[in-house]
Amino acid sequence: MVLDISEIRTAWQDSDFITDCLCWHNVYRQRHAAPPLTMSSELCHLAQTWANHLAHTNRFYYRNDRDIGQNLFCRPSNGLVQEVTGQEVATYWYSAVRQYDYGKEPDCLHANVNAGHFTQIVWVSTRYCGVGKARSRSGKVVVVAHYMPPGNISGSYMENVLPPCEEYPRVAPPPRLILPASSVTTGSSRTTSPST
């Protein structure tokens, strides 16, 4: 049986990958005194639809939608079937922390190129997250995360991207979270730059 990748749907409530990714987002947010994110079924659906599109078309680019924050991850196929974990993806995005300068309001164009994945993860005013994952016919894995309200807003970095706390728990998150679905409207009048 051949399954058309554009028809794959993920129920986030049953996805260990999605709950693991959310959990690690919240571990990193806690390090920066940001409140925990809540998973949104609407954002999961949008992220899964976009991940399916990218995998099906074998392309890799951000949605043209300034009303949501976005992070993308891609692992090309190396001939072996390799699964990615939510921890691996969130850690990859967070690793851009090394590029961020807490001492000044960054130039949005340069900040997003260097640290946009990180800043979106820890953006204090972001409250909701949705994640989708798809595999292309060639085996490439694409992961998409969408955030509401979006981060990486020019002029708002200083109050939304806080330095790491002196002390934070260094315990691994639980392997699986069961979270209630949430509904988030996607209307926003703030202008953002796509994060990379």
Where do the model's predicted regions map?
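Generic structural "secondary-structure junction" signal
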Residues: M39, Y62, Q70, C74, ...
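A solvent-exposed, acidic/Ser-Thr-rich amphipathic alpha-helical stretch
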Residues: Y61-A90
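Disulfide-stabilized extracellular recognition modules
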Residues: Q82-R190, P194-T196
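General secretory precursor processing signal
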Residues: W24-N26, S77, A111, Y168
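Generic short alpha-helical segment signal, independent of protein family or function
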Residues: N52-A55, S77, Y94, R98
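Disordered inhibitory propeptide/activation segment of secreted metzincin zinc metalloprotease zymogens
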Residues: M1-L3
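Short, well-ordered surface patches within globular domains
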Residues: S6-G69
